[in-house]
Each structure stands twice: as structure tokens, then as C-alpha cells.
Amino acid sequence: VVLSKKAMGKAGKRMPAFGKTTDASIAEMNIRDFSINPASGISADKQGKYLGVVESGTKTAKGATSGLDYLKSLGVTHVQIMPMYDYGSVNETGDLSYNADGAQNWGYDPENYNVPEGSYSSNPSNPSSRVTEMKQMVKGLHKNNIRVIMDVVYNHVHNAANHSFNKTVPGYYFRYDDNGSLVNDSGCGNDTASERAMMRKYIVDSVTYWAKNYNIDGFRFDLMGLIDTKTMQEVRAALDKIDPSIIVLGEGWDMNSTMDKSEMTIQPNAYQVASDGTNNGIAFFNDSIRDGLKGSVFSDLSLIHI
């Protein structure tokens, strides 16, 4: 499919530089969960969709503020949106109604990293709909002074055997063990090989594409610990050329991995991706603080959820 720039719509202008990452107040959101409920007051044709996120003036049947107005009332500076690139677990042209079987997934099963998810568009069969409507959503949030952090999952794909990576260069884009089996440190059946030149370039080009063409204000890296520090350094450098205040943060869990510990983007290696004084560096979700407050997520019971 070839789309003209006119057909894809305009992204508008970037928001002004934000400041320090530590000044951000971030709410996490799934597009469908946020707007699918029939009682939300959001227009029926926009429920569960990109455009439902930015419909204003909505209230529930009981008169409570909902949708965009509710999000604004939280006073957040950023909304971190769960994966909104194309993912594999939902049939985009199937039944997407409220409570429909198989219509909901958080999207941590990537297919096409650089294509918006079609199930969030008004017409998944029309390629331009998902592009223009995602841009409208981002512009609508920006208009209301809310910046957008995109949740990205470059550490694994939905199905390695059928993925375009393996069809392009079989065996190159993924990690394999000594027995020739796919490495599964992610727990998702396959791990991408960020340390290889073209996978690294793909990741850097991808975030650059989203930042330039959709004016994305930040990126949250899923299982960032499985991505090497050199790749993350290049991600930061590429985004700095667009806007040094773009937020980059991620899950720097110290996981079992075939990678050398010194190369993993984990908290002990945070100094390798820290701010150089001209940018925001790369931030980490801190499981050490979490576990200090509530105990280990794997072995301790707690009434606290963090």
C-alpha cells in the first residue's frame, strides 16, 4: 500500500520542549480500555478507537466526567499509551464490540512496528484511517497540553517464524542458543538481537520515525534490560536531534540473559545511558524501590500493589 502525504494527514507541530524527566507526571492508558465502555458517554462509533480518546464533553450515565476530560482532570503531563503499533493477537476486521471474544489485548505481541494498530481505527480495511486517526489523537492530546509516550516492545515479536524479520534475513534478527533454538529470556518465545547492526538500526530508525511523523513525546521500552546499552545510546542520540526533551524510559530489569551483564540496559549500568547535561538521558522503572516497599514480587505476599 502506498499512501500519499496528503492521504496520511498532518501531524502538526511538536509541543515545546518539556524540561526534566523528573518533572513528568505520567498516566498509563490502553486505548480500547479507556474508551470502549458503552456507559462512558463517548460516541458509539468512537468507543475503543483513537478518536474516542480525544472526544471531549463526555459523561457517564451517572454524570461523572469521562474520557478526555477525566484524563485532563488528573493533571498529568504525559499519557503513556500501551502498544498502538500493529500487533498480532486481535483480528482487526473481526467483531470488536464491547465484550466480544478476542477483541481486547494490550498489544505486547508486535507484528509491524511502524504501522498503527488497525483495530483502534474507524475502518481497519482502509490503510489511511489508522494513520490519520492516530495523528488526530496525538494532536488532540497535545491541544489539551498532554504529551504522548509510546510503549514500544522491540525485545520480541508475536511469532518469529512468520515475522518479516525472518523472511528478510532468516536467523539474523533473533538470538539463538548453542542448540540453535530461539532464546527466550523475555518469556515470550523469542528475543530480538539488538546488538546486531541492522536490528540496532531498525530500532533507532523506528523511534525516529514515530517521533518525526507522529510527534511522539517519549518512548517506554518494554523489557529494556534485554536491549544492549549501545543501542539505547544510539536511540537517545537520534531523538536528541529531534528534541532533547523527548523522554526515554524503560524496564531495566536485571534478568537472566545470554547477553553479557555489562552490555544490558539494566539499573547497575544506568551510568552508561545517563544524561550528559544536554538531554534527559534514559530513565528506569525501579523495582528495587518497589520491592523495598512491598517485598519481592516473586516471593513475598503483600496487600500493597505498586
Tell what function each PLM region has.
Residues V1-E28, F34-G48:
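The feature marks proteins involved in alpha-glucan
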Residues M8, I304-H305:
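Extended hydrophobic/Leu-rich segments
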Residues M8-A11, W210, W253:
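Tryptophan-centered motif/residue detector
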Residues A27, M150, G250:
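Active-site flanking residues adjacent to catalytic metal/cofactor-binding acidic residues
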Residues R32-K62, S66-Y214, M232-D243, I247, ...:
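Substrate-binding/active-site clefts of carbohydrate-active enzymes
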Residues D101, Y108, L223-I304:
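Active-site-proximal helices and loops of the catalytic beta/alpha 8
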Residues G218-F219:
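Active-site capping/gating regions of soluble enzymes
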